[in-house]
Amino acid sequence: SESFADLVLPPDHRPGQQHPLVVVQYTSDGFLRGGTGDEVPIHPLANRGFAVLSFDRPTFSAAALTATSEEELVRANRADWIDRRRVQSSLEIALELAIETGAVDAGRMGISGFSDGGSTVQWALINSDLFQVASMGSCCEDMYSYPTAAGPRFTDFVRAMGYRHFEPGTEEFWRPMSLILNVDTVDVPILIQTGDSEYEGGLDVIETYSHRGRAIELYVLENETHVKWQPAHRQAIYERSTEWFEFWLMNRINCDPARAQQYRRWSEMEGAPSSEELQCFDGQSLLP
């Protein structure tokens, strides 16, 4: 199956310039807005100096497409994590092509993802060292909270899909995908903005990373479904995602006093830029 991507550059890009890159992904039909879930704004990011790779993941494997039921399809797709491996392979090819244009700084790349795209983020952080920062609109497929947060019927459902939970061989099964099991090697700042209807599914990951001093931040949005629908929340997600990537990839902040508490937290995180390195969006130093 095929996949494709669009590379969006800043409107004032000139040949020879290199820009930090943000991946926006899951599906892309060529209408470049904010990716699946519409949470990471492509054109505003480009307008702030980012290269943005809008990536459309490949469809299911040939084995999965011959399935005659949803359960059979998902089990085939999950066998040896074949779907995750295929998506990662396609993403890496798209990134190679983007870097070959000469417009991307390969040492400053971030990834975002929502729903299945969040799982793509997980896999990429564990199985590659391509990215320096991540943003997720939902979190996370892992061993403990994910199968239990929605109750026993959901636990039975994910087991029927081929996942292993609370049984012999669980850790071996989850090793390539579990952020919990890979906390010692995943050292990337992670922003999570999720609805109150499903945030419990990632609490095991969030507690593990917080307890270990990793750079992680969770926002829970009230009265939200899987796809966020409230205009105020959608605007806040747009702004926070943009500022998160600017902070970690550009050493740049929004110097509006209303943002001071946000940047105080972020500056105290592991690996954060120092105050000497930070500049306001208008280019002014924070120092006198």
Regions found by a protein language model. Name each.
Residues 24-29, 93-149, 285-287:
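Primarily recognizes the serine-hydrolase "nucleophile elbow" in alpha/beta-hydrolase
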Residues 56-60, 140, 222-224:
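Short beta-to-alpha linker loops that shape the active-site pocket of alpha/beta-hydrolase fold enzymes
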